[in-house]
């Protein structure tokens, strides 16, 4: 377990979705016309889907959840498409390329949050909620305070993710396509807004499904060609890789990346519980018809992602053989052109030529679009459904709520483009780590305890949730990444890079303490309502109509 956690800790920079796929300065490449043509085909096709979806979006349910008509298999593919990022593909294969076996430990460790979602969250979440996870958290608690907290937690996570995605998208596209950074950021922002604005969840779902299929096909082809090169023998694969890698046989030894078990444990908890608190992932469970389909969604998604991460392991070792030992992919200093994160892209060229390189480059761009579309819809629903329709203007009509949601999409898109430009040369690696920490420290404890702990009260959820959120933010600021590397101080006040271990503990302890000491009449009433909520969560009685929060 210690080896797993230490590998996880070292690998977080590779997990920063598209943001960390390319970090620091990049060398702009010649214009890749094959990639641009393939990407244009993808854009035209998905815009056609958006037009088709726009004709079917007639209600709030259609816009937020595609009318609940997505099947478990389709939703599983869409979840995989939402979760498998550009850096999952480029970053993990790069980790295998540089560190060998530790990359496999990390890629499998990336899945540890999904059993929690499958066994503890998916079924009850679908039975209790309608559009956002705040529907579940506020089921028996006070609507206003809980929805404000849930919306704030969602928006902070979405904002951090969006900034990271936009910066990563600009740098990645500049490297792969030869396009100007600013043009790339604007292009991603405009396409993102079009998908969500006109097609809602239905268009977003199909963009994610198409992206997942393309990514799985591309990775499968690369892995197949690598295995064909070694006669479909893993022994030959590892032997040839060890023969050409600078570390030799050491690449087959796990646990050599970091020596700090506290940071490793903190990161492991952040990734595990943070996955179960990501608003754009949780929102996908409301797109299916019932709890059975929700469980099937997680089952299929976990299968697709597990298969994908195994492929990245083969791709990483293939890159060691076919890219690392080939001087054509090195610069004058002997380093990989574009950095180690480009190992998979160079391998695409090695096994499939320029045409397949163009395909993989286009898939990387499509990957970013699928993720930012899901994030934008989650952020818009938090504003329009949780804040506008249930806090600031109760009783708002569906038309008014949808209008606010679409305005929010435009605002989020413009803000994402502006911040993507402003953060071009900034270190944004910490943002995804902070997003996971906040999701794990604020969203996850409230969701879990609202469904499973009968003694939870509004006071406990509010105080504990805000404490968890603020603790994660403050400790991240005081830690080595921001306090030393960005702000330039000599020594960090908080010695660990990842705050999740401490902020999650603060959140759970705060929720428990302030709920246990809540003797108010309102608190007692909320405890008494747990039984009715429990029955609903187990049986799904009334789920077809949903609760009108």
Curated annotation (Swiss-Prot):
Keywords: Cell inner membrane, Cell membrane, Ion transport, Membrane, Sodium, Sodium transport, Symport, Transmembrane, Transmembrane helix, Transport. It is a multi-pass membrane protein. GO terms for molecular function: acetate transmembrane transporter activity; glycolate transmembrane transporter activity; symporter activity. GO terms for cellular component: plasma membrane. The chain crosses the membrane at residues 33-53, 77-97, 103-123, 148-168, 183-203, 206-226, 262-282, 303-323, 355-375, 404-424, 428-448, 464-484, 493-513. InterPro entries: Cation/Ac_symporter_ActP, Na/Glc_symporter_sf, Na/solute_symporter, Na/solute_symporter_CS, Sodium:Solute_Symporter. CDD domains: SLC5sbd_u4. It is found in: Cell inner membrane. One of its GO terms (biological process) is plasma membrane acetate transport. It comes from the Bacteria. Transports acetate. PANTHER family: CATION_ACETATE SYMPORTER ACTP (PTHR48086:SF6), SODIUM/PROLINE SYMPORTER-RELATED (PTHR48086). This is Cation/acetate symporter ActP. The gene is actP.
